[in-house]
């Protein structure tokens, strides 16, 4: 059986909390911000949790987290 490895691209994007939930950053906040409203940009601040349907995929990419 080959060695298990962490997907480094996923390790840079996700943080696993002690309770088991996975934290991720918000999308749509990098560029083309002039046409987005201030309210929209404000709501994109901070981080949010990964959706339940994506949790298994993210956890498979982070076997040691």
UniProtKB/Swiss-Prot annotation:
Keyword terms, alphabetized: Ribonucleoprotein, Ribosomal protein
Select a single GO molecular function from the record's annotations and give it.
structural constituent of ribosome
Looking at the keywords, is rRNA-binding present? Answer: no
Q: Which residues form a coiled coil?
A: none
Which Gene3D superfamilies does its entry note? 4.10.410.60
- A family per Pfam: Ribosomal_L35p
Please verify whether the record's keywords include Ribosomal protein.
yes
Source species, domain of life: Bacteria
Gene Ontology cellular component annotations, sorted alphabetically: cytosolic large ribosomal subunit
Instruction: List the InterPro entries.
Output: Ribosomal_bL35, Ribosomal_bL35-like, Ribosomal_bL35_CS, Ribosomal_bL35_sf
Q: Name one GO biological process term.
A: translation
**PANTHER family tied to this protein:** 54S RIBOSOMAL PROTEIN BL35M, LARGE RIBOSOMAL SUBUNIT PROTEIN BL35M
Q: What family is this protein classified in?
A: Belongs to the bacterial ribosomal protein bL35 family.
Q: What is this protein called?
A: Large ribosomal subunit protein bL35
Q: Which organism is it from?
A: Paraburkholderia xenovorans (strain LB400)
């Amino acid at each position: 059986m080959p060695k298990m490895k962490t997907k480094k691209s996923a390790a840079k994007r996700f943080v696993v909390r002690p309770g088991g939930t996975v934290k991720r950053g918000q999308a749509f906040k990098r560029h083309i911000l002039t046409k987005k409203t201030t309210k929209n940009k404000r709501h994109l601040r901070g981080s949010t949790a990964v959706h339940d349907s994506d949790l298994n995929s993210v956890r498979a990419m982070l076997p040691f987290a």
